[in-house]
Amino acid sequence: MGSSSLLSFSLCLLLLCHLSQAQFGSSQESPFQSPRRSVSSRNECRIERLNALEPTRTVRSEAGVTDYFDEDNEQFRCAGVSTIRRVIEPRGLLLPSMSNAPRLVYIVQGRGIVGLVMPGCPETFQSFQRSEREEGERHRWSRDEHQKVYQFQEGDVLAVPNGFAYWCYNNGENPVVAITVLDTSNDANQLDRSHRQFLLAGRQEQGRQRYGREGSIKENILRGFSTELLAAAFGVNMELARKLQCRDDTRGEIVRAENGLQVLRPSGMEEEEREEGRSINGFEETYCSMKIKQNIGDPRRADVFNPRGGRITTLNSEKLPILRFIQMSAERVVLYRNAMVSPHWNINAHSIMYCTGGRGRVEVADDRGETVFDGELRQGQLLIVPQNFAMLERAGSEGFQLVSIKTSDRAMVSTIVGKTSALRGMPVEVLMNSYRLSRDEARRVKLTRGDEVAIFTPRRESRAEA
């Protein structure tokens, strides 16, 4: 009897471990693989020329603007992603919706609050109305329960799995600017390779193409049900059911909350303390309490720092475990005037680079050794660099800041020159014979950059150091 109980317990524990690994990814997976990428995208990367991209379609709402990049562009088809930029005005509410693809959202500017509804998780936040103005209704609406609400600020990365309801609100004094990259080639998306947004509220015009026809109207999903059955499902009358369908709502997907949005949320200090005290071993951080954001704009979080060159901050699934679930990661690069990033390539991911400030010169080379991009990337522009394409970036006189969203949760980079680089790891005689160099020349190629890693100071400063 005792051995039977022990066997049952062991089987249950084994099943739990298996499900945990299936849900969030096994820690033993090779970092060189991107197992949740669609194979169909591999035939669409025969690109002869890359271009700096800007939005091609704009949709205006009551309290903001949504800009869409052309997902049919060959660069987006190669990477298997779709990209959106939103500007949310103060007191603007991005209405609840969900998408067919997982996404990463980078906050370029502003602050606010965001809600991500985890299916099946309890409403753990309870708020009570205490204002005298509402005291008369206290007994009718004394308490509201909802899932956790997060505060976000400039430099935050938000991870949103596909199919999860998501909303955000600008409670600051300045517009919120956010760039969103959706991985439409992720195996979690079992529809087509296009981004599909499913509105839970409101209705939205599809917008006007910068060079093309006007779009149609997108209704929310409740509009697709009959009013009668919808009323029965919610247990409300027909009039209220019609309001849920937003038949005459012309405000768009970003609406203005005239009286603000009063929801319960932890203070920034409380939220930070809670996150610092939480283990990330995959068992103690449960599905319902999973952390969905982290800041990569704070200089104190930099992984690479050069006091005269700049800094690089990476965010992967080791730091934010939910990224293992959506198979994406992010990188923030800040270059000072005339500084450079070492020539490098992405080993296991495509890179969607968005310039958040300044400007810089970028060069990209393909597998034939051809230059597929040689130009300037300015604030608000986007460049997609396919996997293994080599790139080189140099800041202009204003500096150069960019964020890269990558299609692997543990994206890896190989630098060509500098400390820990490909050439640094080769014997001098290999370099001599490969490039027909003298021994002295080979040593200079290998060692001139000294201990600089990934970010190089302007050349004249390097000479001064020497």
UniProtKB/Swiss-Prot annotation:
The keyword Coiled coil does not apply. GO terms for biological process: seed development; seed maturation. GO terms for cellular component: extraorganismal space. GO terms for molecular function: nutrient reservoir activity. Keywords: Disulfide bond, Seed storage protein, Signal, Storage protein. Disulfide bonds join 45-78, 121-288. Residues 1-22 form the signal peptide. SMART domains: Cupin_1 (SM00835). The keyword Signal applies. It comes from the Eukaryota. Residues 50-242, 294-443 form the Cupin type-1 domain. It holds the Pfam family Cupin_1. Endosperm of the seeds. InterPro entries: 11S_seedstore_pln (IPR006044), Cupin_1 (IPR006045), RmlC-like_jellyroll (IPR014710), RmlC_Cupin_sf (IPR011051), Seed_Storage-Functional (IPR050253). Belongs to the 11S seed storage protein (globulins) family. Hexamer; each subunit is composed of an acidic and a basic chain derived from a single precursor and linked by a disulfide bond. Seed storage protein. This is Cocosin 1. The gene is COS-1.
